[in-house]
Amino acid sequence: MVQQVPENISFPAEEEKILEFWSKHNCFQECLKQSKLRPKFTFYDGPPFATGLPHYGHILAGTIKDIVTRYAHQSGFHVDRRFGWDCHGLPVEYEIDKTLGIKGPEDVAKMGIAEYNKQCRAIVMRYSAEWKSTVTRLGRWIDFDNDYKTLYPQFMESVWWVFKQLYDKGLVYRGVKVMPFSTACGTPLSNFESNQNYKDVQDPSVFVTFPLEEDENTSLVAWTTTPWTLPSNLALCVNPEIQYVKIKDVARGKLFILTEARLSALYKQESDYEILERFPGASLKGKKYKPLFDYFIKCKENGAFTVLVDHYVKDEEGTGVVHQAPYFGADDHRVCMDFNIIQKDSVPVCPVDASGCFTEEVTHFVGQYVKDADKNIIRMLKEQGRLLAAGTFTHSYPFCWRSDTPLIYKSVPSWFVRVEPMVDQLLKNNDLCYWVPEFVREKRFGNWLKEARDWAISRNRYWGTPIPLWVSEDLEEVVCIGSVAELEELSGTKISDLHRESIDHLTIPSRCGKAPLRRVSEVFDCWFESGSMPYAQVHYPFESKREFEDAFPADFIAEGIDQTRGWFYTLLVLATALFGQPPFKNVIVNGLILASDGQKMSKRKKNYPDPVSIIDKYGADALRLYLINSPVVRAENLRFKEEGVRDVLKDVLLPWYNAYRFFIQNVFRLHKEEEVKFLYNEHTVRESPNITDRWVLSFMQSLLGFFETEMAAYRLYTVVPRLVKFVDILTNWYVRMNRRRLKGESGVEDCVMALETLFSVLLSLCRLMAPYTPFLTELMYQNLKLLIDPASLRDKDTLSIHYLMLPRVREELIDKKTENAVSRMQSVIELGRVIRDRKTIPIKYPLKEIVVIHQDPEALEDIRSLEKYIIEELNVRKVTLSTDKNKYGIRLRAEPDHMVLGKRLKGAFKAVMMAIKRLSNEELERFQKSGSIVVEGHELHEEDIRLMYTFDQATGGTAQFEAHSDAQALVLLDVTPDQSMVDEGMAREVINRIQKLRKKCNLVPTDEITVYYNAKSEGRYLNNVIESHTDFIFATIKAPLKPYPVPTSDNILIQEQTQLKGSELEITLTKGSCVPGPACAYVNLNICANGTEQGGVLLLENPKGDNQLNLVKLKTVVTSVFGVKNAKLSVFHGETEIQNQTDLLSLSGRTLCVTAGASPSPISSPSTLLCQYLNLQLLNAEPQECLTGTVGTLLLENPLGQNGLTHQGLVHEAAKVFGLRSRRLRLFLNETQTQEITEDIPMKTLNMKTVYVSVLPTTADG
């Protein structure tokens, strides 16, 4: 049985219930079972570390993945969704080092690798429960039970296989390179890792002198921001083609050499120095200089402490003289190698250990952390007279992505994968991938690939997949292992785990007769593992070989833009190297989520709300929709604002929920009042003649087509705004314009058609929105599905909305002409609303006229066809349509598009702009028709000029109008006040107050109430308004409206006093309807005879319980009251003809059709008595003339709108009802007989009231 929908909803609480429902029915796994035989859609999930809690970046990427994979399932695919965990590498080790106070390799050696890795393993899944809880709570369907972890032996074995493939292809080598080095983690990083975390920092800025051996009074001046590298200086480098100068420092009396372009870096005024000589840098080549320190003086034997030349030196900063520390700078290393200052087999001049501290060679600073040693080195240079100037320099500098500490550049031996020879193939494969947004492929990722460098894949660490190379001591003999079986065979040992503690001790016999081969000490960079994820997660090629190859490359992946230098890159490098093809076909790249102030989100700064608290407060659907409906899905940044999530709930989810609630309310009303059970069957729904039904159905089908196209193109950022717009269309337009139809005010048949339309649209919208808002759509669907005719389901499994396939576009329902017509109507209404807002005239107050001016007659015809909606929505009496601008003083005005024309016309723009503004109305009309115009010699088109209407209020007697326009239409609204309209506005205010009280009591429309009122105003104004608008108020509130007092027997629901335009109004709602309808049984009549059609009412008894009609009497009364002469009448209820034996009282409240011919066509049946009426209550006399009732009913009109009752007629008819024609009567509005009904009381104010009949005594009675 369909459930009533509460007015108030806690979205988070309802989502928790949906989670229980999914869990109880194992919906996700069932979903996978159902789709097992469908075509596969392959999705790779990038593995996060579980050593930290999920943040908004994870939530965003997870939401994108969930939306696309849900969509793929609903599009007819089978989608395996396995969660993955990155378990190795620096993030884990760094946490352990901090916890255990480990400073370097010596501490690990003392502990032992086995114990160290045991500690790492223990925290790998530290936050896995929180991850699972948050991901599940967000509504993401992903398989945690069948996850993959990079620490699984099967995963690690596949990583070995990947590496061996590369090794066998000659893509692996060992080299010594200057690399980014994390002193906090004690390991080198790859170039793409070092590019992930740049910060602006202040470093020392020092100018140091290097006296020439040939002339110690002349010094080269070098500049550096890393004083700690100066103890390792082996050379200086200049640019051979730049002009250098020898100058005399006036103050110091010394001679210095530097580039002429950088003199300003040292001297503020030219008078501070004298240029003695100019020469190219090439002339400095080979000159010897005095070293700063003697730590590596032996290197002088190999040509150290010499001036070298290279074009990498620039004169844009520094002095044009660069100090060379070849083991701490990549360019330094290359140049010194070129000039044989160092050789491949040289002992490295690298006096810095893995912790970033000076080793014993640097005796003055041994044990000092290099950055801390800067100030001490500067002090020593000053003492030695080698410091020319010192300050600070702000620049962007790389930090370790894990420890957030500054990196240094340091030469270390590492294992590399050759990437540089692959660049062309990488670019080619990148072009085969579809990127959303496109610019990421071309710009960010493409540019990165063009500059790709060989990848350092080894880390001098412990917790990771060991590099499977067994080597001789001299590294001449190398065996690369590609599987567990291979290692077991070569080592003769059974293996159960592949971590260092399990295999480091294993040796392999040498084929060359050398000592047994031992494994190299390094482990893989964890990015190598995640890049191997497509193969390793399925243990390829050891298992699932066919399945993997059939499903590779992946159909879809998604991550943040930072992964262009991370996971996206490593995936592409490995897939290109292994298979020569890209690893994925489609990729969505999201931007970064920042704090509301634009800064990076920081736990330390606490500058963002906790994601769990946001979900608990607003729900996951609101958070999901907020993130997806933002620039972040276009790879732009998003400043996260809590109020944005709140607004999604308020502006999208609540209105959508209320439309659904309104639908359910009216399904209940239909069943209760009309005894019609609503069941939807899309195969038997009749085409509605109502234009708004056709419009909203067409709009939905157009949306479906757009949804299919854009989702297939992975453009979520275009889909969500359209879905959100449709919620607005549905709630603020369709439901609003059809409230009366949906509430049954236009008859049962039309009500059912409107409900069918709304049901169809609600269900389709739920199916489209299901991937985006999985909870709310499930909540609605669980109730809506109970209204689907089982005969139409065709054995589909309908337990969850997420089992349903997406609806297909029904082209036959698309009606673009109707969509355009309604769009034009909406524009008119919106323009009218702007005018009302501008003049602060509430919509409750009716206005006389709206004039719509449009140059397109077809547009005006469209607007004419929807005129009644304009009248209702803008509350106007009359709509006037015209193409005559001049009649109303309307002229055209032009505004240039500054951006478009300014860019195109440049210097000529100003003159063209002025000329555009001077164009006459006639010229602009010609431009409006032709679409082009020549201004100042430039041909301009529609995209260059914006036309607007202007309104001259003083022209042509139009002073009563206010105007507003858009590009196509201008609307004039007559805002002149009119008393009858003001009165109606007051009546609407009364209705508004009553409905608000209803809402306060959480009443639904089918709850029966009585409304009592007490109005206090000057001259009884408010009383008069209420009395004269009683019918209007009742038609809206569907409840009896009575003046005070409130009977003591009534059950009061709520009572409230309010102010209304200076009047006091007290309203009381009581439970139950004090006037449930006519006291006597009745039927509504629809009479079709003699070529005319009439409506009216017949009372089947009067007074109650007496004077009952049979069929013969009914026909006689019809002939008399409705003037039907000379016709043989037949009476029908629906399609069934009434027979003589029919009990007419059983048909009370129904509508009968009286015809002089065949069975009538179906008619709508009003839910209340068709004519106005009042009830009679006899107070103090027994009925006469054998009549037994004391309660009766009088019709104030019959037929409908005819034969209105007068006061005299009321007295006469009351006496007639009770057989008291010979008695004098007095009539009262209350039982206490204090409010007598006199001739000056309008009869229409008595509608639906009870009139109390008092019989005056006769002489005989006395």
Swiss-Prot record:
Phosphoserine found at: 1049
EC number: 6.1.1.5
Top-level enzyme category: ligase
Annotated residues for binding of ATP: 603
Keywords: Acetylation, Aminoacyl-tRNA synthetase, ATP-binding, Cytoplasm, Ligase, Nucleotide-binding, Phosphoprotein, Protein biosynthesis
InterPro entries found in the cross-reference section: aa-tRNA-synth_I_CS, aa-tRNA-synth_Ia, Anticodon_Ile_ABEc, Ile-tRNA-ligase, Ile-tRNA-ligase_type2, M/V/L/I-tRNA-synth_anticd-bd, Rossmann-like_a/b/a_fold, tRNAsynth_Ia_anticodon-bd
Subcellular location: Cytoplasm; Cytoplasm, Cytosol
Record keyword 4Fe-4S present: no
GO biological process: isoleucyl-tRNA aminoacylation
Listed Pfam families: Anticodon_1 (PF08264), DUF5915 (PF19302), tRNA-synt_1 (PF00133), Ubiquitin_IARS1 (PF23567)
Residue list for modification Phosphothreonine: 1058
GO MF annotation list: aminoacyl-tRNA deacylase activity; ATP binding; GTPase binding; isoleucine-tRNA ligase activity; tRNA binding
'KMSKS' region, short sequence motif: residues: 600-604
Principal localisation: cytoplasm
Reaction(s) the record says it catalyses: tRNA(Ile) + L-isoleucine + ATP = L-isoleucyl-tRNA(Ile) + AMP + diphosphate
Cleavable signal peptide: none
Domain of life: Eukaryota
PANTHER family noted in UniProt: ISOLEUCINE--TRNA LIGASE, CYTOPLASMIC (PTHR42780:SF1), SOLEUCYL-TRNA SYNTHETASE (PTHR42780)
Record function comment: Catalyzes the specific attachment of an amino acid to its cognate tRNA in a 2 step reaction: the amino acid (AA) is first activated by ATP to form AA-AMP and then transferred to the acceptor end of the tRNA.
Quaternary state and interactors: Part of a multisubunit complex that groups tRNA ligases for Arg (RARS1), Asp (DARS1), Gln (QARS1), Ile (IARS1), Leu (LARS1), Lys (KARS1), Met (MARS1) the bifunctional ligase for Glu and Pro (EPRS1) and the auxiliary subunits AIMP1/p43, AIMP2/p38 and EEF1E1/p18.
Stated family: Belongs to the class-I aminoacyl-tRNA synthetase family.
Matching HAMAP family: Ile_tRNA_synth_type2
Protein name (record): Isoleucine--tRNA ligase, cytoplasmic
Organism: Mus musculus
Designated gene of the protein: Iars1
